[in-house]
């Protein structure tokens, strides 16, 4: 009887050990899968968001935006006020993403290069969104000087809750927010103060408006 009870105990221990061994790989696999999933999210998320906190950051962004598609499906977050008064900055060539200004200001903007379609953004693409930002500066290009705006030379996206304070000067299609607001463009809740000069199609908010402009104020 003693031998029989000892054998039964040994069998019970063996069964328990086998059950534990079967459970451990599944648990380890689940933990590894969770870790892999977390690492995947961490690797991909930052690639879609760009943070700006200095003039150098903005200059690098402008270089990247020479390629029209670079900013598409990206979010740009302005994390601090940026002063451009002591740097060489010629505007952002083309923007097609989402710009979150977070109520910060870009000051000291000075654009004087020759050509048309000038502004902080030369082109705001269809589907793009620029919002919650103040721009202060002087935009007086040389040469043809058409389609000049404080925020955008040409807008085919949405500009909302933005303000411009300063001087915008050109020949035709001159506006405090946008030189041209295309048929796909929308400008909403924006404000302009300062001076806007031009000969043809001149407006405090937008020079030539083919789209929607609403709830804006003009003190230019």
Identify the role of each PLM range.
Residues 12-22:
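Bacterial N-terminal signal peptides
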Residues 29-220:
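Surface-exposed repetitive/solenoidal architectures
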Residues 1-14:
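Bacterial N-terminal signal peptides that target proteins for export
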């Amino acid at each position: 009887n003693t031998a029989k009870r000892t054998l039964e105990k040994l069998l019970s221990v063996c069964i328990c050990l086998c059950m534990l061994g079967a459970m451990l790989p599944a648990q380890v696999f689940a933990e590894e899968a969770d870790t892999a999933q977390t690492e995947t999210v961490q690797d991909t998320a930052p690639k879609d968001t760009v943070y700006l906190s200095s003039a150098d950051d903005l200059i690098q962004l402008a270089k990247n935006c020479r390629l029209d598609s670079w900013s598409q499906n990206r979010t740009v977050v302005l994390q601090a006020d940026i002063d451009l008064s002591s740097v060489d900055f010629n505007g952002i060539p083309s923007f097609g993403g989402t710009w979150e200004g977070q109520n910060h200001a870009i000051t000291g903007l000075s654009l004087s290069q020759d050509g048309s379609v000038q502004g902080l953004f030369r082109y705001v693409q269809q589907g793009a969104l620029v919002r919650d930002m103040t721009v202060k500066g002087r935009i007086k290009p040389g040469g043809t000087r058409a389609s000049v705006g404080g925020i955008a030379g040409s807008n085919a996206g949405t500009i909302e809750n933005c303000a411009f304070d300063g001087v915008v000067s050109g020949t035709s299609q001159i506006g405090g927010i946008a030189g041209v607001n295309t048929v796909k463009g929308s400008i909403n809740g924006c404000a302009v103060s300062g001076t806007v000069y031009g000969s043809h199609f001149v407006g405090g908010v937008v020079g030539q408006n083919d789209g929607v402009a609403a709830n804006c104020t003009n003190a230019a």
